Amino acid sequence: MGIIEFLLALAQDMALSAIPAVGFAMVFNVPHRALRWCALLGAIGHGSRMVMMTAGFNIEWSTFMASMLVGCIGIQWSRWYLAHPKVFTVAAVIPMFPGISAYTAMISAVKISHFGYSEPQMILLLSNFLKASSIVGALSIGLSIPGLWLYRKRPRV
């Protein structure tokens, strides 16, 4: 993949991830003045995850680092716009949730329940369930770490 194709794919990924970020921000009653920043932060988070995955990181570590980036930027923007960081960050990380692997794990569980136990279905269930759980854990931990670092009152040593 050449650099032009990569940049076009990155721009498409960022544009398409801004849409659900704005949608969920509207569901969460984010103020209208903050909607564009939620879209931008969702695009930055998903785009940075794509860049890291293209560089060779696996999806769990890429999601963890992208959610830490979203958390840091959200805290900075909350200071500038006098809003809570969750106004920007929660809707921005939702496009990174693992819908496909969670859905595949659920379908595998239904197939095991309906057709009976089979080893390939169980392997598919466990691998997708663990992948989805790891990504959700990476999102939640990565989103909370910047707040722990940046709002610390006591000295570190």
Swiss-Prot record:
The keyword Transport is assigned to this record: yes
Membrane topology: Multi-pass membrane protein
GO biological process, one term: succinate transport
Main location per the UniProt record: membrane
Keywords recorded for this protein, A-Z: Cell inner membrane, Cell membrane, Membrane, Transmembrane, Transmembrane helix, Transport
InterPro entries hit by this protein: ThrE_2, ThrE_Dicarb/AminoAcid_Exp, YjjB
Transmembrane domains' residue ranges: 8-28, 55-75, 87-107, 129-149
Subcellular location: Cell inner membrane
Record has Chaperone as a keyword: no
Pfam family for this entry, one: ThrE_2
GO cellular component assignments: plasma membrane
Subunit record text: The transporter is composed of YjjB and YjjP.
Family: Belongs to the ThrE exporter (TC 2.A.79) family.
Free-text function comment from the UniProt entry: Involved in succinate export with YjjP. Both proteins are required for export.
Protein's name according to its UniProt entry: Probable succinate transporter subunit YjjB
Gene name for this UniProt entry: yjjB
